[in-house]
């Protein structure tokens, strides 16, 4: 089946149809229409898979996809234009330009945590740049994945875009085929496998991964607003967000006050019993719940931690000053557990931060510009928010992506178009007479020419 779909898509791409801007816009408009048609079903599926509140599903999934489609439709023609480039003195009389062109057949493997948004946003970029797409959504969010297939089937012909459902064996099988581009969102561990498979065929790829995202809080901040924004970013989608604050590094002078404010904001957001809150999500499955429970077993100073396996529920949990060698401080948590670690000075801070790889996200709460600038200059990361969390993801004019262990490449808006485009460099020369120095035999004395060129 997979071979047949790939052959169809290859033939369709070679027909040049996808290179038409009008075709791309028409395709995306049809997708937008069907998303709006099935919007309530999308909410229902996200509720079944992750217990997402309808408002959260709209703001963090559906709205972002619709916004991305509209942004592409508005800008495709401009982005696709041939771009004139200033000629070099060495290419006298030439016309230099760059032509963006689609790669061809693209494979997208998407995760379960934001199953609608993270499946569709990369697809929009690929289609908008003129590629064909095969999408493999996660089997861990089955209701949403099945609905995505239904929406895609009503929006595109199979030879243009197709969704293939299945488990990790299907994903492995797909990776054995030759692609012109691979886009993967998921764990660093699986990302390395994808990179290895792509390297065997010299296939370009983007990896959107994760990491331990630090959240630094210094003593200058207003604690009420700081706690509110941290709680929102950490416990959104039950902590299952790749850019969620993974742990807090707080100045020891305000540790107890911040913890009290965080406890208060958790109760304000989700009530005294978050299990009864319609605004609090669920862990995706029992396997991940067991993993999260294992992080808590050896911790002594815990606030929260209640678990209900039947309901896939883990209470919003604070772990106070875990050891830096504990698993909870060495592994991306990806759940509603928030370690709070104290520091006394900038040296302490650097010692703790240096233990981790470059994260996907970085958060600093401070009014001290010098402190903020020092941190931003010293550490490398995918993206950051100052005095807030998550919001760097919302601006489609900013590239979104990691570095090193947290990812390779970036997307969103024009950055998605660039990701899924190859830029051909062209130099066109007229048949004017060339400078005689270009061709052999070369002069032994070229000091005059050398002096001129060295000044340019």
Predicted regions and their residues:
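Rossmann-like NAD(P) dinucleotide-binding subdomain of oxidoreductase/dehydrogenase enzymes
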Residues: 89-225
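Conserved C-terminal structural/oligomerization subdomain of aldehyde/semialdehyde dehydrogenase
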Residues: 20, 216, 314-456
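Residues at or immediately preceding the N-termini of alpha-helices
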Residues: 2, 21, 39, 223, ...
């Amino acid at each position: 089946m997979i071979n047949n779909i790939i052959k169809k898509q290859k033939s369709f791409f070679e027909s040049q149809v996808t290179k038409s801007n009008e075709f791309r816009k028409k395709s995306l408009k049809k997708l937008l229409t069907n998303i709006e048609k099935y919007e309530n079903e999308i909410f229902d599926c996200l509720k079944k898979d992750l217990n997402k509140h309808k408002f959260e599903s709209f703001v963090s999934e559906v709205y972002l996809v619709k916004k991305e489609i509209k942004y592409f439709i508005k800008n495709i023609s401009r982005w696709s234009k041939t771009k004139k480039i200033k000629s070099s003195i060495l290419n006298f009389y030439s016309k230099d330009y760059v032509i963006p062109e689609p790669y061809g057949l693209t494979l997208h493997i998407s995760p379960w945590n934001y199953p609608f948004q993270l499946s569709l946003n990369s697809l929009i970029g690929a289609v908008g740049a003129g590629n064909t797409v095969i999408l493999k959504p996660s089997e861990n969010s089955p209701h949403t994945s099945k609905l995505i297939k239904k929406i895609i089937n009503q929006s595109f012909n199979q030879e243009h875009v197709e969704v293939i459902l299945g488990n990790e064996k299907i994903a492995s099988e797909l990776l054995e085929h030759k692609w012109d581009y691979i886009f993967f969102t998921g764990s660093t561990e699986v990302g390395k496998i994808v990179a290895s498979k792509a390297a065997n065929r010299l296939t370009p790829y983007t990896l959107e991964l994760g990491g331990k995202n630090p959240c630094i809080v210094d003593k200058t901040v207003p604690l009420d607003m700081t706690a509110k924004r941290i709680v929102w970013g950490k416990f959104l989608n039950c902590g299952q967000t790749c850019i969620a604050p993974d742990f807090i590094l707080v100045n020891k002078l305000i540790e107890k006050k911040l913890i009290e404010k965080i406890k208060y904001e958790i109760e304000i957001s989700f009530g005294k019993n978050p299990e009864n809150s319609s605004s609090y999500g669920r862990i995706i499955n029992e396997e991940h719940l067991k993993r999260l429970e294992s992080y808590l077993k050896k911790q002594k100073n815990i606030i929260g931690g209640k678990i209900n396996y039947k309901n896939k529920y883990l209470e919003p949990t604070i772990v106070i000053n875990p050891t830096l060698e504990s698993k909870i401080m060495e592994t991306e948590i990806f759940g509603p557990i928030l370690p709070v670690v104290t520091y006394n000075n900038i040296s302490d801070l650097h010692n703790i931060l240096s233990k981790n790889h470059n994260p996907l996200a970085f958060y600093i709460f401070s009014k001290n510009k010098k402190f903020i600038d020092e941190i931003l200059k010293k550490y490398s990361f995918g993206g950051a928010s100052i005095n807030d969390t998550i919001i760097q993801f919302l601006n489609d004019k900013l590239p979104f992506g990691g570095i090193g262990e947290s990812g390779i490449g970036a997307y969103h808006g024009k950055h998605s178009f660039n990701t899924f485009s190859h830029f051909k460099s062209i130099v066109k020369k007229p048949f004017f007479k060339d400078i005689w120095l270009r061709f052999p035999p070369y002069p032994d004395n070229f000091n005059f020419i050398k002096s001129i060129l060295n000044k340019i």
